Amino acid sequence: MKLTITIMVVVVLIVFVIAGYVIIRYRRRPGDKSIPVQVEGNHKLEIIWTVIPIILLIIVGIPTVNSVFGLAKDYTKDPNAVQINVTAHQYWWEFEYPNLGVKTAQELLIPEGTIISVEAKTADVLHSFWIPSLAGKVDTNPGGNVNRMYFKADHTGVFLGKCAELCGPSHSLMDFKVKVVDKASFDRWVAAMKNPVALPEDQEIATVLNKQCLTCHAIGDKGVQLYPNLTGIGSRESVGGKLINTDQPEYANEGSVEENLKTWIKDPQAVKPGTLMPKVDLTDQQIDAIAKYLAGLKLDY
């Protein structure tokens, strides 16, 4: 892509410079009634401006053809690729690593320099999985259809992912993050996701968590995975894909992960209209305690 753009920019500059020079140098001057020298043709110039474009097309065409044929490769059985099952929900994303025994939500963590093999489907309506800075998009079609795509991140960083198909009132809020880390960090993250997680020491809060949260969500080896897995939620960039987690004072409109969890638990519909999570009947003290516990679920990788 960079090579192609560079070639195009160079060609455009050369053409415009020559065109500008010719227009100025050979313009009709006031009082000049003469007829310019008539040129029938110039074989040398014609050969030059025929051969040069051919060479440029070959330079651009070879990597293009290689890239196009590369798209036909199937990495679903490649032992060196990271296999990820992506499931789109209204209005969140589920990421399962079937070969690693890990399932998470809203943040896709991948190793740099490794082929990522994605199998995408939807749990409800039409969505589209899109990471603008890393890959193209692939639709998740209803009816049990599975679409595939492959990509590779060449450097570490955090990238924004989005749903690229109108899917309901909170379509614009259906964002997710992609974290690209080195291979060692990725391996530590996988191990951390599998570690057992202790419930709150306060038995009342532990009971509330079991009855109100773990009937839909999973935390470590506890609960069920019907809805977003909450393991390591304290380390995530956002809550609900919308509330950005930050403690930095310059971001006055955002909140800490604990504050954002309180906001979400109190009234999910106010944050993300149309979400399937209901407003749970909890006291402020219970919400505070659960938010504090969840905010403490951090992963060290």
Regions found by a protein language model. Give the residues of each.
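The canonical Cys-X-X-Cys-His
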Residues: 163, 209-220, 261, 277, ...
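Axial heme c-ligation environment in periplasmic c-type cytochrome domains
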Residues: 171-174, 225-230, 247, 264-297, ...
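Sequence/structural segment immediately N-terminal to covalent heme-attachment motifs in c-type
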Residues: 198-223, 227-230
